[in-house]
Amino acid sequence: KPLLAWTIEHCLAGGVDSVYVSSDAEGILDVGEKYGARSIKRPEEISGDEATSESGWLHALEVIEGDHGKVDWILGPQVSSPLRTADDIRKGLSVARSDLYDSLFSCSVAEDLFIWENRSGSLKSVNYDWQNRKRRQDIPRQYIENGSFYLFRPEILYQNNNRFGGKIGVVEMEFWKMFEIDSIEDLKMCSTLMKEFILMEK
């Protein structure tokens, strides 16, 4: 099954009203339509590796609102993150509809992750003070933006040209769901995790 198909199926089963695939490639649009998505032909000037997700979302939003009227929320899933489930999407939509937030991101909880940064050859601790190391239970809850999906109101995108704005919230996911596919090694790892945690449940 194509990688794109997993994301489309997650969105449809998770309760997304309308699912669109935006691309300048006919082959990708054909796959999207095969699995139940509608197509939006993306202009060449906002396609390719240099294009931002925001530019694609803005174009798609203008097309959709021009054809169908105002949109309440935008869900932007990452196709290379196949380890999410329809329940994760459903949970995200539920949080969005609570009207407590203006933008949301899927996340994994960062437990026992102490991050260091190399600044011009000098190592600096990023998310804790190594000179005042705290007990695990005393550390504030920290989140990893796992990129699986984002939810935001259209006005946030229009005003900020950014997926984030207003009051920002999170949709927590299990840690193993944060992995994405960018290499052959990633593909092997995600395949193993999917077989162990997702396909075994079906």
Each predicted region: which residue ranges?
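Short phosphate-binding loop-to-helix
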Residues: L12, Y20, E26-L75, R84-K91
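Histidine-centered beta-alpha loop that forms part of the nucleotide-sugar donor binding/catalytic region
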Residues: E44, Q78, S108-V109
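Short active-site oxyanion
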Residues: G15-Y20, D102, W176-M178
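N-terminal glycine-rich phosphate-binding loop and ensuing alpha1 helix
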Residues: K1-S22
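Hydrophobic helical membrane-anchoring modules
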Residues: V170-E172, K177-K202
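Short beta-strand scaffold positions
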Residues: V21-S23, L151, I181
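Conserved core of the sugar-phosphate nucleotidyltransferase
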Residues: S55, W73, P82-K167, E172-E174
